[in-house]
């Protein structure tokens, strides 16, 4: 199956099951992890797709971002997940804290339906307050597919 077809099929799945994945954990397992698998990540290899990645903030130890995509043992993308019933507006500060303590260059905040992509375009090593890309999986268009690859 072609990538575009997989994404379209997954988008339809999101619409169908979003009302049953009510907890953060069920959102991760039914909506978020499957998308990263479609994108080509080995979600079962913690050397590539690491769950509960430690991103200690200052004196606060044990802080963990939901997932980190690793290259050579270093995080390149941090993924902070919320329940699909949770609006994302109030949660970027959590990702902001994690971003500043790691070598990651991209951060994704998602509830499995909406994906907000952040980086540090405005100031090096400091996550921008505004996402450079936002994708709603319920309304994904062919033009959005190119942003995912």
Where are these regions (language model features)?
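Charged, often low-complexity linker/regulatory segments
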Residues: 1-39
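Short, flexible loop/turn elements at secondary-structure junctions
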Residues: 53-55, 71, 82-85, 139
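Conserved small/polar residues in nucleotide/adenosyl-binding loops
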Residues: 146-149
């Amino acid at each position: 199956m072609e990538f575009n077809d997989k994404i379209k099929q997954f988008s339809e799945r999101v619409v169908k099951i979003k009302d049953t994945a009510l907890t953060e954990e069920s959102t991760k397992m039914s909506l978020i992890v499957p998308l990263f698998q479609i994108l080509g990540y080995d979600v079962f290899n913690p050397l590539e797709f690491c769950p509960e990645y430690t991103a200690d903030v200052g004196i606060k130890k044990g802080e963990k971002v939901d997932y980190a995509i690793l290259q050579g043992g270093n995080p390149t993308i941090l993924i902070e997940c919320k329940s699909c019933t949770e609006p994302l507006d109030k949660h970027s500060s959590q990702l902001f804290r994690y971003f500043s303590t790691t070598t990651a260059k991209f951060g994704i905040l998602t509830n499995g339906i909406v994906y907000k992509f952040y980086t540090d375009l405005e100031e090096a090593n400091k996550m921008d307050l505004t996402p450079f890309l936002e994708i709603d999986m319920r309304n994904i268009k062919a033009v959005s597919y190119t942003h995912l690859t």
